[in-house]
A protein has these predicted regions:
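N-proximal low-complexity "stem/linker" segments adjacent to membrane-targeting elements
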Residues: 3-94
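Short beta-strand/turn micro-motifs composed of small residues
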Residues: 80-82, 107-111, 189
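Short, solvent-exposed loop/turn segments at secondary-structure junctions
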Residues: 83-86, 111-114, 134-136, 171-174, ...
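Active-site-proximal specificity loops/subdomain of glycosyltransferases
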Residues: 108-163
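Short glycine-/acidic-enriched loop or helix-start segments at secondary-structure transitions
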Residues: 117-118, 175-179, 216
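GT-A fold catalytic core of metal-dependent nucleotide-sugar glycosyltransferases
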Residues: 153-193
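Catalytic core and acceptor-binding pocket of nucleotide-sugar-dependent glycosyltransferases
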Residues: 199-296
Protein backbone atom coordinates (compact mmCIF):
# COMPACT_ATOMS: atom_id res chain seq x y z
CA UNK A 1 0.00 0.00 0.00
CA UNK A 2 1.48 3.37 -1.00
CA UNK A 3 1.02 6.68 0.80
CA UNK A 4 -1.52 8.07 -1.68
CA UNK A 5 -3.78 5.06 -1.15
CA UNK A 6 -3.47 5.41 2.61
CA UNK A 7 -4.36 9.11 2.45
CA UNK A 8 -7.37 8.48 0.23
CA UNK A 9 -8.75 5.91 2.69
CA UNK A 10 -8.00 8.11 5.71
CA UNK A 11 -9.46 11.26 4.24
CA UNK A 12 -12.63 9.53 3.02
CA UNK A 13 -13.37 8.03 6.43
CA UNK A 14 -12.40 11.26 8.19
CA UNK A 15 -14.91 13.20 6.08
CA UNK A 16 -17.57 10.55 6.74
CA UNK A 17 -17.12 10.95 10.47
CA UNK A 18 -17.06 14.76 10.43
CA UNK A 19 -20.18 14.81 8.22
CA UNK A 20 -22.28 13.35 11.04
CA UNK A 21 -20.80 15.56 13.77
CA UNK A 22 -23.71 17.12 15.72
CA UNK A 23 -22.91 20.85 15.36
CA UNK A 24 -24.82 23.31 17.55
CA UNK A 25 -25.90 20.40 19.72
CA UNK A 26 -25.73 19.65 23.40
CA UNK A 27 -22.75 18.10 25.15
CA UNK A 28 -24.84 14.96 25.51
CA UNK A 29 -25.36 14.75 21.72
CA UNK A 30 -21.63 15.15 21.08
CA UNK A 31 -20.88 12.42 23.61
CA UNK A 32 -23.35 10.07 21.89
CA UNK A 33 -21.75 10.84 18.52
CA UNK A 34 -18.31 10.13 19.90
CA UNK A 35 -19.36 6.83 21.44
CA UNK A 36 -21.14 5.78 18.26
CA UNK A 37 -18.31 6.60 15.85
CA UNK A 38 -14.96 6.57 17.66
CA UNK A 39 -14.54 2.82 18.08
CA UNK A 40 -15.82 2.11 14.57
CA UNK A 41 -13.31 4.42 12.91
CA UNK A 42 -10.48 3.22 15.15
CA UNK A 43 -11.07 -0.37 14.06
CA UNK A 44 -11.56 0.61 10.41
CA UNK A 45 -8.33 2.59 10.11
CA UNK A 46 -5.85 0.58 12.18
CA UNK A 47 -5.29 -2.25 9.64
CA UNK A 48 -4.47 0.27 6.90
CA UNK A 49 -1.88 2.02 9.09
CA UNK A 50 -0.02 -1.19 9.87
CA UNK A 51 -0.33 -2.48 6.31
CA UNK A 52 1.32 0.73 5.09
CA UNK A 53 4.03 0.57 7.76
CA UNK A 54 4.80 -3.06 6.99
CA UNK A 55 4.85 -2.43 3.24
CA UNK A 56 7.09 0.63 3.57
CA UNK A 57 9.47 -0.37 6.36
CA UNK A 58 9.05 -4.13 6.74
CA UNK A 59 12.13 -5.13 4.74
CA UNK A 60 14.49 -2.76 6.60
CA UNK A 61 13.09 -3.75 9.98
CA UNK A 62 13.27 -7.44 9.11
CA UNK A 63 16.95 -7.09 8.19
CA UNK A 64 17.63 -5.59 11.62
CA UNK A 65 15.48 -8.26 13.28
CA UNK A 66 17.57 -11.04 11.76
CA UNK A 67 20.67 -9.76 13.61
CA UNK A 68 19.03 -8.57 16.82
CA UNK A 69 19.32 -10.32 20.18
CA UNK A 70 17.17 -9.07 23.05
CA UNK A 71 19.18 -8.68 26.27
CA UNK A 72 17.82 -11.05 28.90
CA UNK A 73 18.39 -8.41 31.57
CA UNK A 74 18.47 -4.63 31.26
CA UNK A 75 17.71 -1.59 33.39
CA UNK A 76 14.94 -0.87 30.89
CA UNK A 77 12.23 -3.30 29.82
CA UNK A 78 9.64 -3.23 27.07
CA UNK A 79 6.44 -4.80 28.38
CA UNK A 80 3.53 -6.08 26.29
CA UNK A 81 0.40 -7.53 27.90
CA UNK A 82 -1.59 -9.24 25.15
CA UNK A 83 -3.61 -12.45 25.21
CA UNK A 84 -4.71 -12.42 21.54
CA UNK A 85 -3.18 -13.71 18.32
CA UNK A 86 -3.05 -10.11 17.16
CA UNK A 87 -2.40 -9.29 13.46
CA UNK A 88 0.20 -6.61 14.35
CA UNK A 89 2.68 -8.92 16.08
CA UNK A 90 5.04 -9.29 13.09
CA UNK A 91 5.54 -5.54 12.66
CA UNK A 92 5.55 -4.60 16.33
CA UNK A 93 8.26 -7.08 17.32
CA UNK A 94 10.54 -5.75 14.59
CA UNK A 95 9.70 -2.12 15.34
CA UNK A 96 10.62 -2.39 19.02
CA UNK A 97 13.79 -4.39 18.30
CA UNK A 98 14.93 -1.60 15.97
CA UNK A 99 13.85 1.32 18.17
CA UNK A 100 15.02 0.09 21.60
CA UNK A 101 17.66 -2.63 21.08
CA UNK A 102 19.07 -2.15 24.59
CA UNK A 103 15.75 -3.07 26.27
CA UNK A 104 14.76 -6.49 27.53
CA UNK A 105 11.35 -7.73 26.39
CA UNK A 106 8.58 -9.12 28.58
CA UNK A 107 5.41 -10.46 26.96
CA UNK A 108 2.57 -11.42 29.29
CA UNK A 109 0.48 -13.66 27.07
CA UNK A 110 -2.12 -16.41 27.48
CA UNK A 111 -2.02 -20.17 27.10
CA UNK A 112 -3.94 -19.66 23.84
CA UNK A 113 -1.42 -17.44 22.04
CA UNK A 114 1.86 -18.60 23.62
CA UNK A 115 2.68 -21.08 20.85
CA UNK A 116 1.96 -18.50 18.15
CA UNK A 117 4.28 -16.02 19.85
CA UNK A 118 7.02 -18.61 20.12
CA UNK A 119 6.78 -19.12 16.36
CA UNK A 120 6.95 -15.35 15.75
CA UNK A 121 10.01 -15.06 18.01
CA UNK A 122 11.78 -18.06 16.50
CA UNK A 123 15.36 -18.35 17.75
CA UNK A 124 14.83 -15.20 19.86
CA UNK A 125 12.31 -16.94 22.14
CA UNK A 126 15.06 -17.96 24.59
CA UNK A 127 16.02 -14.33 25.26
CA UNK A 128 12.47 -13.00 25.61
CA UNK A 129 10.52 -13.31 28.87
CA UNK A 130 7.35 -14.98 27.54
CA UNK A 131 4.99 -15.38 30.49
CA UNK A 132 1.58 -17.13 30.16
CA UNK A 133 -0.29 -14.78 32.50
CA UNK A 134 -3.85 -15.37 31.27
CA UNK A 135 -5.90 -18.51 30.67
CA UNK A 136 -8.40 -19.18 27.91
CA UNK A 137 -10.41 -16.96 25.57
CA UNK A 138 -12.69 -14.31 27.06
CA UNK A 139 -14.96 -11.53 25.78
CA UNK A 140 -13.50 -8.16 24.86
CA UNK A 141 -14.95 -6.54 27.99
CA UNK A 142 -13.66 -9.29 30.27
CA UNK A 143 -10.25 -9.10 28.62
CA UNK A 144 -10.12 -5.37 29.28
CA UNK A 145 -11.06 -5.90 32.94
CA UNK A 146 -8.37 -8.56 33.43
CA UNK A 147 -5.74 -6.35 31.79
CA UNK A 148 -6.65 -3.40 34.02
CA UNK A 149 -6.41 -5.64 37.09
CA UNK A 150 -2.98 -6.84 35.95
CA UNK A 151 -1.55 -3.32 35.94
CA UNK A 152 -2.97 -2.70 39.42
CA UNK A 153 -1.22 -5.77 40.87
CA UNK A 154 2.16 -5.58 42.64
CA UNK A 155 2.96 -9.22 41.78
CA UNK A 156 2.89 -8.34 38.08
CA UNK A 157 5.56 -5.64 38.46
CA UNK A 158 7.70 -7.86 40.69
CA UNK A 159 8.13 -10.25 37.74
CA UNK A 160 9.91 -7.55 35.72
CA UNK A 161 13.63 -7.44 36.53
CA UNK A 162 14.34 -3.84 35.55
CA UNK A 163 14.38 -0.32 36.96
CA UNK A 164 11.96 1.05 34.37
CA UNK A 165 9.44 -0.38 31.96
CA UNK A 166 7.81 0.97 28.83
CA UNK A 167 4.30 -0.41 28.46
CA UNK A 168 3.56 -0.99 24.78
CA UNK A 169 0.12 -1.81 23.33
CA UNK A 170 -0.62 -3.50 20.01
CA UNK A 171 -1.78 -0.32 18.27
CA UNK A 172 1.40 1.63 18.97
CA UNK A 173 4.73 2.05 17.22
CA UNK A 174 7.96 4.04 17.37
CA UNK A 175 8.88 6.64 14.75
CA UNK A 176 12.38 7.15 16.11
CA UNK A 177 15.02 5.41 18.15
CA UNK A 178 14.10 5.40 21.84
CA UNK A 179 16.75 7.23 23.92
CA UNK A 180 17.41 6.13 27.48
CA UNK A 181 16.62 9.72 28.49
CA UNK A 182 12.87 9.01 28.29
CA UNK A 183 13.12 6.77 31.35
CA UNK A 184 12.64 9.45 34.00
CA UNK A 185 10.11 10.22 36.72
CA UNK A 186 7.78 7.62 38.21
CA UNK A 187 5.00 7.45 35.60
CA UNK A 188 3.83 9.24 32.48
CA UNK A 189 2.19 8.67 29.12
CA UNK A 190 0.76 10.65 26.24
CA UNK A 191 -0.58 14.00 27.51
CA UNK A 192 -4.37 14.08 27.78
CA UNK A 193 -5.76 17.26 26.25
CA UNK A 194 -8.63 17.55 28.71
CA UNK A 195 -6.30 17.32 31.77
CA UNK A 196 -2.81 18.26 30.47
CA UNK A 197 -1.43 18.77 33.95
CA UNK A 198 -2.07 15.11 34.84
CA UNK A 199 0.43 12.31 34.10
CA UNK A 200 -1.54 11.17 31.05
CA UNK A 201 -1.46 7.59 29.82
CA UNK A 202 -2.69 5.55 26.88
CA UNK A 203 -0.95 2.75 25.00
CA UNK A 204 2.60 3.97 25.67
CA UNK A 205 3.59 4.67 29.28
CA UNK A 206 6.90 4.86 31.12
CA UNK A 207 6.79 3.41 34.63
CA UNK A 208 9.36 3.15 37.39
CA UNK A 209 8.98 -0.41 38.68
CA UNK A 210 9.61 0.41 42.36
CA UNK A 211 7.01 3.19 42.26
CA UNK A 212 4.42 0.88 40.68
CA UNK A 213 4.97 -1.78 43.35
CA UNK A 214 4.73 0.87 46.05
CA UNK A 215 1.48 2.27 44.64
CA UNK A 216 -0.11 -1.16 44.25
CA UNK A 217 0.76 -2.06 47.84
CA UNK A 218 -0.22 1.28 49.41
CA UNK A 219 -3.84 2.24 49.85
CA UNK A 220 -5.98 -0.58 48.40
CA UNK A 221 -8.99 1.73 48.70
CA UNK A 222 -7.60 3.56 45.67
CA UNK A 223 -8.61 0.67 43.42
CA UNK A 224 -11.64 1.52 41.28
CA UNK A 225 -13.17 0.33 38.00
CA UNK A 226 -11.38 3.00 35.93
CA UNK A 227 -8.68 2.30 33.37
CA UNK A 228 -5.37 1.35 34.91
CA UNK A 229 -3.54 4.41 33.56
CA UNK A 230 -6.08 6.77 35.14
CA UNK A 231 -5.93 4.76 38.36
CA UNK A 232 -2.14 4.97 38.53
CA UNK A 233 -2.26 8.65 37.56
CA UNK A 234 -4.59 9.36 40.49
CA UNK A 235 -2.18 7.63 42.87
CA UNK A 236 0.80 9.48 41.37
CA UNK A 237 -0.92 12.80 42.14
CA UNK A 238 -2.26 11.71 45.54
CA UNK A 239 1.11 10.55 46.86
CA UNK A 240 3.29 13.15 45.16
CA UNK A 241 5.29 10.95 42.83
CA UNK A 242 7.46 12.43 40.08
CA UNK A 243 6.04 13.29 36.63
CA UNK A 244 8.01 14.95 33.80
CA UNK A 245 6.77 18.27 32.42
CA UNK A 246 4.10 18.33 29.74
CA UNK A 247 6.66 19.85 27.35
CA UNK A 248 8.86 16.79 27.82
CA UNK A 249 5.97 14.31 27.58
CA UNK A 250 4.66 15.92 24.39
CA UNK A 251 7.99 15.26 22.68
CA UNK A 252 7.99 11.59 23.70
CA UNK A 253 4.47 10.24 23.04
CA UNK A 254 1.48 11.27 20.93
CA UNK A 255 -2.08 10.01 21.11
CA UNK A 256 -4.94 12.53 20.94
CA UNK A 257 -3.31 15.90 20.26
CA UNK A 258 -1.85 17.32 17.02
CA UNK A 259 1.95 17.01 16.75
CA UNK A 260 4.06 20.12 17.40
CA UNK A 261 7.21 18.10 16.75
CA UNK A 262 7.91 14.53 15.64
CA UNK A 263 7.22 12.31 18.68
CA UNK A 264 9.16 9.17 19.52
CA UNK A 265 6.13 6.93 19.96
CA UNK A 266 2.59 6.88 18.56
CA UNK A 267 -0.61 5.42 19.99
CA UNK A 268 -3.61 5.13 17.64
CA UNK A 269 -3.55 8.75 16.50
CA UNK A 270 -6.07 7.81 13.79
CA UNK A 271 -8.77 7.47 16.46
CA UNK A 272 -8.43 11.12 17.47
CA UNK A 273 -8.05 12.98 14.18
CA UNK A 274 -11.10 15.09 15.06
CA UNK A 275 -9.00 16.69 17.82
CA UNK A 276 -6.40 17.88 15.30
CA UNK A 277 -8.71 20.54 13.79
CA UNK A 278 -7.48 19.86 10.24
CA UNK A 279 -8.79 22.49 7.82
CA UNK A 280 -7.91 21.12 4.37
CA UNK A 281 -6.55 18.07 2.58
CA UNK A 282 -3.05 19.49 2.21
CA UNK A 283 -2.72 19.95 5.97
CA UNK A 284 -4.28 16.52 6.48
CA UNK A 285 -1.66 14.86 4.26
CA UNK A 286 1.18 16.71 6.00
CA UNK A 287 0.10 15.52 9.45
CA UNK A 288 -0.50 11.92 8.38
CA UNK A 289 2.88 11.75 6.60
CA UNK A 290 4.60 13.01 9.76
CA UNK A 291 2.93 10.31 11.85
CA UNK A 292 3.67 7.35 9.58
CA UNK A 293 7.29 8.18 8.66
CA UNK A 294 9.86 6.10 10.52
CA UNK A 295 13.51 7.19 10.80
CA UNK A 296 14.70 3.81 9.55
Amino acid sequence: MDFNTLIEIFYTLYKERTAVYPTNSSESDVKKWNEATLDFFRIQLEPYVFKYLEHTYGAALDAHWAKHVFPKKSRFALVIVERRCHPNWWFILRNIAWAAPYCSLYIFCSNTNQAVLQSYLGDKADTVHLIPWFTGDVSRDEGRIQTNITFKTAEFYKMIDADYMLRFEMDTYFLQKVPEAIFVGDFYGSPWGWVPERPGGGGLTVRKISAMIDICEKDRALIDPSGEDAWIGNAIVKYGYSVPTIEFRSQVFLENSPPHSVPIGIHQFWTFLMNFNIQDRSAFEKIIRCLVTLAV
